[in-house]
């Protein structure tokens, strides 16, 4: 009887260990990846006509985890290619919002929604994947606001 109990205890311990190894970890859910380069779809209103792209950094060692962190930028199409660096965006599911640092008293704010977050895997280049409201601010006051669609543009 003692031998049966020892064998049973060993089998139980082995089974518990194999379940612990095989079970997926639920303590670290995968982070949402909304990184990419996005350009305004169609002809934008005059106040936003000089925006070349919006770049959103990834949650990796080259983006949010870099030192210092890279969250992205709003880049103008002027000769200097002025970048308005993003503060850390807020991402909740498919929703994103961000603000930029001011350059010469001008800054931008955005609130929008991704149609899906697998646009890179599905190679959805030049397709609308993000819609939202972009605001241009001067000295902290809104000077222009528009509902815009953005295409995914691989490689910027």
For every predicted segment, state its role.
Residues 8-18:
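Bacterial N-terminal signal peptides
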Residues 24-156:
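Central antiparallel beta-sheet cores of small beta-barrel/beta-sandwich binding domains
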Residues 20-22:
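Signal peptide processing junction and immediate N-terminal pro/mature segment
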Residues 1-9:
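Bacterial N-terminal signal peptides that target proteins for export
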